[in-house]
From Swiss-Prot:
Biased composition (Polar residues): 270-285
Keyword vocabulary terms for this entry: LIM domain, Metal-binding, Zinc
Gene name of the record: adcE
Presence of keyword Metal-binding: yes
Classification of source organism: Eukaryota, Amoebozoa, Evosea, Eumycetozoa, Dictyostelia
Organism: Dictyostelium discoideum
Limits of the LIM zinc-binding domain: 348-413
Source superkingdom: Eukaryota
SUPFAM superfamilies registered for this protein in UniProt: E set domains, Glucocorticoid receptor-like (DNA-binding domain), MIT domain
Full protein name: Arrestin domain-containing protein E
Biased composition (Pro residues): 250-259
Composition bias type Low complexity, residue spans: 74-146, 260-269
Length: 564
């Protein structure tokens, strides 16, 4: 089952990457969601640590790519009009309406100095649309300038991207975009409390990471969306400059500095982990590359997944599933599709403690568990003992768990026998119904029995007793052969007869039989890996006739005698 789930997840990943390369981002987004869900289910069932680490890393990679596409898709309809719609998309707090003339003059001098240095930078920063280079700042107020491609790139490169220790390692486009979103959100919070200097610094950091994401993004459409989003914070920096200059310098600017070594250490640790698993990444498709390169990487993989990835076509059942849920029509279609998933899926949380699951979790009773939580929460409904986690095997009946042997002992509680006799067309019917098969020494067994005697044979009484069988494996002979030695004993004989109804001839009788198990008997036992010693019990119930005319109907039940 785990291999089938993993195969479905990998085929969904291939389809998602194909849609991603074809710029069908709506379909790719939903396929990534479905693929991540299947890979998580496969991770729960996978027991090999190396495969668990690989699947976990790929789940994180696909989730980041999916989140990256979702954020950009939400802004794609506004890309044709970069000015007004983008300003309405971000809710910035208002700033004071007037500034001092001295600050305005200082800001104009700084802006003129920056514009003189723009010609020394040679890179490409995509623009959101056509900009009007002839517009100038008004004399009565301050408005953000409209920058062309070179000016936008110049503005981004003029920020402190080279001085930040956390950007020494080149981040991927997804990591850079996530960092940019975090800094932009932090800047908006600083602006809400009117800390314009801190907000400007956060916006500058966000623009740094936007530039890294733009340079690493190969798709022109996504580049354009990133450029539009970065331009919003560039313009906002220009608006906040005079207000940031009017604020006093903070007395302790070293407060955010301890975060930088921690961030650098975390990034270095993530970089080392990526290098350690680089040899296993060939079995999974990546985002950069064409379909041919994906197929080559799949065919050349050295792990056990190469047979799963050879078929690049999506299964017919999966195509019908996608067609029924209309993944191509809306971004919220996957949310509607999840209603058809089993309600027992707990979202990678333990059913007992509701905590996140680790890789060594187990799945039982249609739920996911920590191994320890399952052992203390669920016991066998038959023998009232916990389950062994080394080789977990259980049976479920009426939403209760049983050991396989205990489950077999709960079946066959009803037996019946029909006896015919020579020279008579009538029959003797004898049936017994037990309540259970687990008892302790000294306990009383109550069972109902029915005798329907249509013959002329007499049924004088009903007899019940326990038949104990002990089997020992012994080595005999010169060849050291193992042969069983069996010992059989009859214990606790008990009789039932009704003075007014027995002997029973051409009549029917229904009643209850109460049988007391001897208090000194030993429990059922199986010793040794090869069952070198076995102690078993059978409940024998029979109806008998006159001694001189042998007429016996016997029923046997396998019982389990528990330890006191």
């Amino acid at each position: 089952m785990s291999s089938e789930i993993l195969q479905t997840g990998l085929q969904l990943v291939k389809s998602a990457i194909d849609a991603d390369n074809q710029k069908n981002y709506s379909l790719a987004c939903n396929l990534y969601d479905q693929a991540v869900l299947n890979l998580k289910l496969a991770l729960v069932a996978e027991r090999e640590p190396s495969k668990n680490a690989l699947i976990s890393s790929k789940i994180e990679e696909y989730s980041q790519r999916n989140k990256f596409i979702k954020n950009l898709l939400s802004q794609q309809p506004q890309s044709s009009q970069p000015s007004q719609p983008q300003q309405s998309q971000f809710s910035f707090p208002s700033v004071p309406s007037s500034i001092s003339p001295s600050i305005n003059q200082q800001q104009q001098q700084q802006q003129q100095q920056i514009n003189n240095n723009n010609n020394s930078i040679l890179s490409s920063f995509p623009s959101a649309g056509n900009t009007n280079n002839n517009n100038n700042n008004t004399s009565n107020g301050f408005s953000p300038p409209n920058l062309n491609k070179n000016e936008q790139l110049s503005k981004l490169n003029s920020l402190s991207i080279g001085n930040n220790q956390s950007t020494n390692r080149q981040l991927s486009r997804v990591e850079a975009y996530e960092a940019a979103k975090n800094f932009s959100l932090k800047g908006r919070k600083e602006e809400e409390v009117k800390n314009y200097r801190g907000a400007s610094q956060c916006y500058e950091e966000a623009c740094n990471y936007y530039l890294m994401a733009i340079k690493s993004e190969p798709d022109p459409t996504l580049k354009k969306n990133l450029s539009d989003e970065a331009k919003i914070y560039l313009d906002r920096i220009e608006v906040l400059k005079p207000f940031a200059a009017s604020q006093p310098q903070p007395q302790q600017p070293q407060q955010p500095q301890p975060q930088q070594p921690q961030q650098q250490q975390f990034q270095q640790q993530s970089y080392n982990n990526n290098n350690s698993t680089q040899s296993m990444l060939s079995s999974f498709p990546s985002f950069n590359g064409s379909t041919n390169s994906l197929n080559n990487s799949l065919n050349n993989s050295n792990n056990n997944f190469n047979q799963i990835l050879t078929n690049s076509n999506m299964p017919i059942a999966q195509q019908n599933f996608l067609q029924n849920h209309q993944f191509n029509q809306s971004n919220n279609s996957f949310n509607n599709a999840t209603s058809s998933l089993p309600l027992t899926f707990s979202g990678d949380k333990c059913a007992a403690c509701d905590a996140l699951l680790s890789t060594n979790s187990i799945k039982a009773l249609d739920r996911n568990w920590h191994a320890e939580c399952f052992q203390v929460s669920i016991i066998c409904a038959g023998c009232q003992k916990p389950f062994a986690l080394s080789n977990l095997s259980l049976k479920v009946k009426d939403n209760r768990a049983y050991h396989p042997m205990c489950f077999e002992s709960t079946t066959g509680l009803s037996q019946e026998e029909i006896r015919t006799f020579v020279g008579s067309s009538k029959q003797l019917f004898f049936s017994i119904q037990l309540q259970r098969k687990f008892y302790r020494a000294g306990e009383t067994i109550q069972f109902g029995f029915t005798i329907d005697n249509g013959t002329t044979k007499k049924v004088e009484k009903v007899v019940a007793y326990l038949l104990m069988t002990e089997t020992r494996m012994e080595i005999t002979g010169t060849a050291y052969e193992r042969k069983p030695k069996r010992t059989i004993k009859k214990l606790g004989r008990c009789e039932f007869h009704h003075s007014n109804r027995f002997p029973l001839i051409k009549d029917r009788f229904e009643g209850d039989f109460f049988y007391s198990i001897p208090p000194n008997i030993l429990p059922s036992e199986v010793t040794g890996v090869d069952a070198s010693f076995v102690r078993e019990y059978q409940l024998i119930v029979k109806c008998v006739g006159p001694p001189l005319k042998i007429m016996t109907v016997k029923l046997k039940f396998n019982l389990t005698i528990l330890d006191k």
